[in-house]
């Protein structure tokens, strides 16, 4: 399988194969490398690959654990759980907020009245109402939710552990040849960092998400900005010609005696490089990114703004074999003007998620596609008095309770897991941590959550330390 990186709006195809530069037994030079190792190093350089990544990583070319995919809808900034999936209409006025609740299509499950479309699809969802990590720092919270571990803070923002998407890319690869494993739409981010805590950390840049459009990123749901074709896709044709030149290079090397490489690494490199050429020249991935091929009715179902646009694109990508897609839906850090702020956000989220679930169901894809909706934390249950200069109530950071949605994916849906108290302040049953959520995602994909990869120091680090898959939903 192979992976994509964007640099100055051009595509660089990163191919990861089981290839190790190591000291050979014959013909060593003064640096301890054999002719075989030198050949590998030169070969990688000629193809524009990062030998540092290839040394650090070993892509084992395994078949996918299963054919399931994940679409992560990332609500950057932290949405209010009380105005979405855990309303408390009987709480005191200063807690319950501007809206009431409403029934869903599952008796006993109620959502905010601002989510009428999703309310029709509660039977396809598992509503986790008891997730918490008790941290109100954007950076610490986002790192925890996306990696399953505490690590970064506002004073030390560097990513410490790989994201769930990068780990899936590393452990599973794409579901279909000729597609990237991990894509960010329009660009994966967390707390204004790209890819931020959705990156690969010590797994290496080969497992970062393919960032589709860094030129038009962090778009609000209500944005009427015309969504342009990503420059990275516009350059595919030019890149195709450059890759075709690399094919000629490969052909010129066909006479190399493969007996010098008993591991078969060069043959594998040829094969993966050819897959890259096929993708670029035949346009399979390019087609997957093109939502203009969809009907007007379907585009209306998702919503015509950026959030609906990229959620529909995410469906197209998993349909073609991408294993993990993250859709960025930002601007949830609403410290003031909670009513106005959420009226600008919730309808677009509601339409995009509901449209996705309906579309997946109609296409027979829902059982094999896990949809995750989450941000870095919830919001303070008690309304504040606004923020400096904006004396209109909002909600502040709250890591003590939040809601996460898991939908489809073959789960036992139509249920709520866990509960918060009458004011949505903290869990009172089945308390869950971020690593429990991530362990569930890995399990759905057929990946053992205790799978380990080496960190920068060469120590094996499991995907999750203490988290366990949520047995009630499996």
Language model feature labels by segment:
Residues 4, 14-474:
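Ligand-binding pockets and gating/stacking loops
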């Amino acid at each position: 399988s192979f992976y994509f990186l964007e640099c100055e709006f051009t595509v660089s195809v990163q191919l990861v194969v089981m290839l190790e530069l190591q000291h050979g037994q014959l013909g060593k030079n003064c640096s301890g490398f054999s002719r075989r190792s030198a050949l590998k190093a030169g070969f990688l350089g000629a193809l524009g690959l990062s030998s540092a990544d290839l040394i650090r990583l070993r892509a084992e070319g395994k078949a996918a654990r299963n054919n399931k995919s994940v679409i992560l809808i990332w609500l950057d900034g932290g949405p209010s759980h009380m105005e979405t999936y855990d309303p408390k209409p009987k709480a005191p006025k200063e807690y319950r907020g501007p809206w009431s609740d409403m029934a869903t299509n599952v008796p006993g499950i109620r959502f905010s009245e601002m989510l009428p479309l999703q309310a029709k699809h509660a039977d396809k969802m598992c509503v986790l109402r008891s997730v918490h990590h008790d941290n109100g720092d954007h950076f610490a919270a986002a790192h925890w939710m996306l990696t399953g571990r505490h690590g970064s803070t506002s004073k030390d923002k560097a990513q410490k552990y790989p994201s769930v998407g990068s780990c899936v890319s590393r452990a599973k690869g794409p579901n279909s040849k000729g597609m990237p494993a991990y894509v960010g739409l329009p660009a994966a981010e967390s707390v204004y960092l790209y890819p931020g805590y959705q990156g690969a950390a010590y797994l290496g840049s080969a497992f970062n998400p393919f960032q589709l459009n860094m030129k038009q990123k962090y778009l609000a749901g209500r944005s009427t900005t015309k969504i342009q074709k990503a420059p990275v896709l516009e350059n595919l044709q030019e890149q195709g010609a450059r890759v075709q030149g690399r094919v000629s290079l490969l052909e010129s090397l066909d006479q190399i005696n493969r007996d010098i490489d008993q591991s078969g690494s060069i043959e594998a490199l040829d094969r993966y490089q050819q897959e890259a050429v096929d993708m670029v020249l035949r346009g399979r991935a390019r087609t997957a990114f093109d939502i203009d091929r969809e009907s007007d009715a379907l585009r209306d179902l998702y919503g015509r703004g950026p959030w609906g646009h990229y959620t529909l694109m995410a469906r197209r990508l998993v349909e073609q074999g991408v294993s993990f897609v993250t859709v960025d839906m930002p601007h949830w850090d609403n410290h003031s003007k909670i009513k106005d702020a959420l009226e600008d956000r919730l309808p677009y989220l509601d339409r995009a998620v509901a449209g996705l679930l309906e579309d997946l169901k109609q296409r027979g894809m829902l059982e094999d596609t896990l949809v995750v909706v989450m941000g870095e934390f919830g919001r303070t249950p008690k309304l504040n008095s606004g923020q400096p200069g904006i004396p209109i109530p909002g909600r502040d950071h709250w890591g003590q309770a939040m809601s996460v949605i898991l939908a489809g994916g073959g789960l036992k849906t139509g249920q709520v897991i866990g509960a918060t108290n009458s004011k949505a302040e903290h869990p009172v049953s089945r308390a869950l941590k971020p690593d429990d959520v991530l362990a569930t995602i890995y399990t759905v994909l057929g990946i053992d959550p205790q799978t380990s990869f080496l960190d920068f120091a060469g120590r094996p680090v499991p995907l999750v330390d203490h988290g366990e898959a949520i047995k009630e939903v499996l």
